[in-house]
From Swiss-Prot:
Descriptive protein name: Inactive metallocarboxypeptidase ecm14
Function according to Swiss-Prot or TrEMBL: Inactive carboxypeptidase that may play a role in cell wall organization and biogenesis.
Primary gene name: ecm14
Keyword field: Cell wall biogenesis/degradation, Disulfide bond, Glycoprotein, Metal-binding, Secreted, Signal, Vacuole, Zinc
CDD domains found in the cross-reference section: M14_CP_A-B_like
Gene3D superfamilies tied to this protein: Zn peptidases
Protein's organism: Sclerotinia sclerotiorum (strain ATCC 18683 / 1980 / Ss-1)
Start and end residues of each Peptidase M14 domain: 220-540
């Protein structure tokens, strides 16, 4: 009986794979356990949209596909439900927290300082550098700093009187907040007791639904050990328009995987032209988990919208999208296994006890403008340009694509967190304006409006060079900033590689949770990024984000009912476009205001 059940299960799995995966691509593995992915990306076959069509023709196959995926990934573990934060729900006491977590972050707090003058900004930056404090984030109004509660008097003693009372406790108990940020209490316990954490968390493909999401993959943050198989599955299930590629190898020997999404042109004359390509990257800084989940969400939305959404179908015919969930794969793994707030990569420095380089300060353009020479600093760029292995691999891959693979990069969107900002070059200095400043501002304002119209969230638009208060004071250019900006990725792609539209987008939130954004924000933030991509693509097509699908002259693409919409395809897509069209005049008014 047991043998018959096993045979039946195997047959179900085989049939499901045949229906769910139109062209399964074998991914070879090296002897060290890493996927052997070719950095040279093959062109896509010219086929009609597939992969998703099976679910439309035979809806019953949805159950069969889910069964197959559950067999591949496993069922959800039975763990206690994690209490929500904040609210009246009971939180774990210090006695319940893992000892290693308490040893590292017990007694740590996050303070927010309100800044109003250049002198205050400079004083806070110098004090934080003197005490080796972790500057979490800063904007035109505030700066968030992590430190031990016992060190607060020392910090205040280095600050002017105007700042000594201009702060508040953003996170009064950081250790508890970190513990709450893991997908499950069981996983958090395992993360601080054993390095073999993949056994403690097995992703499931079906459970109780989260509002606004039908896929459990986006109901929680996922570790790299889950993201890579998921990417491999996407490339197999939707092989007509998706390829899994490798950007390079990290310092610790891990692959840096990416998904290339797009459809090759049907006409031979078009196929010989350089392929216009847009990059969406996340995870430069390991602790910024929402940037990683937002890249995977955007990838899923693009992949499953092809053939269903006319706007997305056209974008994938006109552009390739390369989506890199995390450049900093070593650091990202480290945040799951050891230190949730680790920021840099895991590269060795000249100080044995201070590992890691800031990948977003390691690129070659204006690298020398970053004066941080302390290897223990969270912003340490290394001793030379491109010393950071992952930054070097990323840049080399991009150059190789343009020089040898007939690729023309037309856009670069680098996701970070937090503070809800859309930033454009230059990052290294406020004294130099980019040649295409007006175009960068115009598109940046449009991206922020696309987010506001779709979700109501406010994203500010500014030059990446602006310090904590420099944008407030006309004619003032900050030279002593909270964090030096030389060697940034957006500057290098813009200036060295000639990518005309290069942006850093700092995602949710504005500080209530900081890097520890609750899982309930994964889908809403992912939707914001997806709307950014749609507006970005339409803008490059010359449609200013208000493209309308042709009706009578083309064969219509049936729009499914709401319950059948793939994750990420918003029913109100046309409504959003109409509202963007109505408000496009506001963008011109904003640009005129900035010119005064």
């Amino acid at each position: 009986m047991s043998q018959s059940h096993s045979i039946l299960s195997s047959l179900i799995l085989l049939v499901a794979i045949i229906f769910c995966v139109p062209h399964v691509i074998a991914v070879p593995w090296t002897t060290d356990g890493h996927a052997q992915l070719s950095p040279v990306t093959p062109r896509y076959p010219t086929q009609e949209p597939s992969g998703i069509r099976y679910r439309n023709v035979i809806p019953q196959l949805t159950w069969l596909c889910d069964t197959a995926i559950e067999k591949i990934f496993g069922l959800p573990p039975k763990v206690a439900k994690k209490p929500d934060v904040p609210g009246n729900v009971a939180r774990p006491t210090n006695a319940q927290l893992p000892a290693t977590l308490l040893a590292k972050y017990g007694g740590d707090v996050v303070l927010r300082f309100n800044l109003t003058t250049p002198a205050e900004e400079q004083a806070l930056a110098e004090a934080a550098d003197t005490l080796f404090l972790d500057i979490w984030e800063f904007t035109s109004n505030w700066a968030d700093i992590r430190l031990r509660e016992d060190d607060v008097p020392s910090l205040l003693g280095l600050l002017p009187k105007s700042l000594q009372n201009a702060y508040s406790h953003l996170m009064p108990d950081l250790a508890k907040s970190i513990y709450q940020s893991y997908p499950s209490m069981a996983y958090a316990d395992a993360a601080f007791s054993s390095k073999h954490v993949e056994r403690a968390f097995t992703p499931a493909l079906r459970t109780s639904k989260v509002e606004g999401a039908d896929n459990i993959f986006f109901q929680n943050y996922q570790p790299l050990s889950v993201i890579i198989p998921w990417m491999r599955l996407m490339s197999s299930m939707f092989s007509t328009h998706v390829r899994m590629i490798n950007i390079g190898i990290s310092y610790e020997g891990r692959d840096i995987p990416a998904l290339r999404i797009g459809v090759s042109p049907n006409l031979p004359s078009e196929a010989t032209k350089p392929r216009k390509t847009i990059i969406l990257s996340g995870g430069f800084h390991a602790r910024e988990w929402i940037s990683v989940s937002s890249v995977t969400y955007a990838a899923w939305s693009l992949i499953t919208s092809y053939g269903k959404s006319p706007a997305i179908t056209k974008l994938l015919q006109e552009f390739d999208f390369v989506l890199v969930p995390t450049i900093n794969v070593d650091g990202y793994v480290y945040t799951w296994e050891n230190d949730r707030l680790w920021r840099k990569n895991r590269q060795q420095t000249n100080l044995r006890f201070c590992r890691g380089l800031d990948l977003d300060r390691g690129f070659g353009f204006e690298w020398g403008s970053s004066t941080q020479t302390n290897p223990c600093s969270e912003s340490y760029p290394g001793d030379a340009p491109f010393q950071a292995v992952e930054s070097h691999r990323f840049a080399e891959w991009a150059k190789n694509e343009t020089e040898n693979n007939n690729v023309h990069f037309v856009g670069f969107l680098d996701l970070h967190s937090y503070s809800q900002q859309v930033l454009y070059p230059y990052s290294y200095s406020c004294l130099a304006d980019p040649p295409s400043l007006e175009n960068l501002e115009e598109l940046g304002i449009g991206l922020a409006k696309a987010i506001r119209i779709s979700s109501g969230e406010q994203y500010t638009v500014a030059s990446a060079c602006e310090g904590a208060i420099s944008s407030k004071i006309p004619g003032y250019s900050s030279t002593s900033r909270m964090e030096m900006g030389g060697g940034s990725a957006i500057d290098w792609f813009y200036h060295e590689l000639g990518v005309r539209y290069s942006y850093q987008i700092k995602l949710r939130d504005t500080g209530s949770y900081g890097f520890l954004l609750p899982k309930e924000n994964i889908v809403p933030t992912g939707e914001e990024v997806f709307n950014v991509i749609k507006y970005f693509g339409d803008f490059l097509l010359g449609d200013k984000g208000i493209e309308k699908a042709k009706s009578s002259e083309e064969e219509p693409i049936t729009k499914p009912v709401k319950s059948e919409l793939p994750l990420g395809v918003m029913e109100e897509e046309s409504v959003i476009s109409d509202e963007i069209e109505d408000e496009y005049e506001d963008i011109n008014l904003e640009l005129k205001r900035r010119r005064r």
